[in-house]
Amino acid sequence: MQRQLGHKRYQPIWEMMHKLRSVMGERDSKYNLEGTIELDEGYFTRNNDSAKDEDEDENQKRGLGSQRKSKVLVMVESEKADNPKPSQKSRKCGHLKMKVITDLKGETLKSAVECSVSPDTTAVMDNFASHSTVEKAVSKSERQTVRGCNAPKVLPWVHIAISNAKSLFTDMYHGIKEEFLQEYLNEFCYKFNRKYFGDRMFDRLVIAAVSYKPTFEHKLYNGRANCG
């Protein structure tokens, strides 16, 4: 973006992009997911802030419990496909939401779901213990035992979304700090939800940018929220 705009300094462009990502999140927060949704958690490796953090990692957990992984609740509208071909998914997807969460406690997940889906939603999810609390936020739930072999059939679009987001962040940004992860997820979901817009996506973003105030603030320019 800096090269395309011909701007000499990186910092203003970096902040502008984060404010646009913030606006994307504000726009998508105005609607709730409906119908049947797939729900699961994703774990995103975050970038270390310093060499000191890398040294501390030697004494930290590995895998899903690692302190270097940010927890993300992923929800996507999903309906059973009518007579899918062998090469097609068993479910077809709608809109997507991804929310960074502080922990995997039932109340934390329930609160995030209540802010993201309609009360009459049906949630398809695995048998993770905290999901029993999530059931209180929806009208109906379908909990199944999900293992590696059947995950693509039970929760196909959740896992596709997580995999694609991880690949994008790794290839394009080479690591993201936790404090900025939600902004990048906002952009990923905004584009995913408008994948059929084509050239109209830019026009819709311009409308959103003048309709919503970005919530992103940073130390640049004294933390002012307005684009400069």
Residue ranges and their predicted role:
Residues 1-228:
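Residue-level recognition of single "structural anchor" positions
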